[in-house]
Curated annotation (Swiss-Prot):
This is 4-hydroxy-3-methylbut-2-enyl diphosphate reductase. Pathway: Isoprenoid biosynthesis; dimethylallyl diphosphate biosynthesis; dimethylallyl diphosphate from (2E)-4-hydroxy-3-methylbutenyl diphosphate: step 1/1; Isoprenoid biosynthesis; isopentenyl diphosphate biosynthesis via DXP pathway; isopentenyl diphosphate from 1-deoxy-D-xylulose 5-phosphate: step 6/6. It comes from Anaeromyxobacter sp. (strain K). Its EC number is 1.17.7.4. [4Fe-4S] cluster binds at C12, C96, C189. It is an enzyme of class 1 (oxidoreductase). One of its GO terms (biological process) is terpenoid biosynthetic process. It catalyses: isopentenyl diphosphate + 2 oxidized [2Fe-2S]-[ferredoxin] + H2O = (2E)-4-hydroxy-3-methylbut-2-enyl diphosphate + 2 reduced [2Fe-2S]-[ferredoxin] + 2 H(+); dimethylallyl diphosphate + 2 oxidized [2Fe-2S]-[ferredoxin] + H2O = (2E)-4-hydroxy-3-methylbut-2-enyl diphosphate + 2 reduced [2Fe-2S]-[ferredoxin] + 2 H(+). (2E)-4-hydroxy-3-methylbut-2-enyl diphosphate binds at H41, H74, H124, T161, S217, N219, S261. It comes from the Bacteria. Gene3D superfamilies: 3.40.50.11270, 4-hydroxy-3-methylbut-2-enyl diphosphate reductase, catalytic domain. Belongs to the IspH family.
Length: 278
């Protein structure tokens, strides 16, 4: 089977930066090292960190004194970081710089009197962190969902870094017709936009698509949605163990894309499995 791999498949710059930082901290510290939440949304990568002795906690309350805490790629809720500082814990900030941008915008624009609207998943760690930096209540609009009525004269719209651009545009358009002043700040990561454009192009050129990445990874799920809209024979898997040969009957070329948190070795494992098909 011929396999066409998307140019952008695998770790983005921000994730690779955080992964390298975790490995460096694990190698240099004798004291316990934990990440505040899964460092990235990929079970295989998290398992590798565990083998290095890096644990995972859900909150600072679970951390023992003397432990080094690494903030994950998606950032953390501001109050949790304040608790860590108050306890004198060593904190290594692995937050992606692109995630820090919507955090800063939420804080700055809320101080300027704007009601903050975030296009994204309210349950995602990144959005929880962004909300914590706003100094006023926020409204989170789920991609594809209705835009609620907001009682505010000034509205500022930002987005989850992995949001689909068309959804951000849709929400801004709806709000622009309702409010006298709407400020739109595009906080979607450039890598996300490039990866999604790459996925669209790939899906239009192949007989089937496999998107590789954690089932809990928002950007990977979005890639699968984008590909499936163009090529119905699209599957989202975490590893080659989930693949079935019958899926690819009649296919000559299979496209392979992967989320920003998918390790290279996982992508290669899926590619090797596909190439072995006859």
């Amino acid at each position: 089977m011929d396999v066409k791999i998307a140019k952008t498949a695998g770790f983005c710059w921000g994730v690779r930066r955080t992964v390298d930082k975790v490995m460096e901290v694990a190698d240099q510290h004798r004291a316990p090292v934990v990440t505040l939440g899964p460092i990235i949304h990929n079970p295989q990568a998290v398992a590798r960190f565990s083998e290095k002795g890096v644990g995972t906690v859900n909150g600072i309350g679970e951390v023992t004194d003397g432990t080094t805490v690494v903030v994950r790629t998606h950032g953390a809720v501001r109050e949790e970081l304040e608790r860590a500082e108050a306890r004198g814990l060593e904190v290594v900030d692995g937050t992606c710089p692109y995630v820090k941008y919507p955090q800063a915008m939420a804080q700055r624009l809320s101080r300027e009197g704007y009601h903050i609207v975030i296009v994204g998943d309210a349950n995602h760690a990144e959005i929880k962190g962004v909300i914590s930096y706003s100094e006023q209540p926020c409204t989170v609009v789920k991609p594809g969902g209705p835009v609620p009525e907001i009682k505010a004269k000034k509205v500022a719209v930002i987005a989850q870094t992995t949001c689909i651009g068309a959804e951000f545009e849709r929400v801004v358009g709806v709000l622009a017709l309702r409010h006298k002043e709407v400020r739109a700040v595009n906080t979607i990561c450039n890598d996300t936009e490039e990866r999604q454009a790459d996925a669209r192009a790939l899906a239009s050129e192949v007989d089937a698509v496999v998107v590789v990445g954690g089932k809990n990874s928002a950007n990977t799920r979005h890639l699968a949605e984008i590909c499936r809209a163009i090529q119905p024979r699209t599957w989202h898997v975490e590893t080659e163990a989930e693949l079935g040969a019958a899926w690819f009957e009649g296919c000559r070329v299979v496209g392979l894309s992967a989320g920003a948190s998918t390790p290279d070795w996982v992508v290669e494992g899926v590619a090797a499995w596909l190439r072995a098909l006859r």
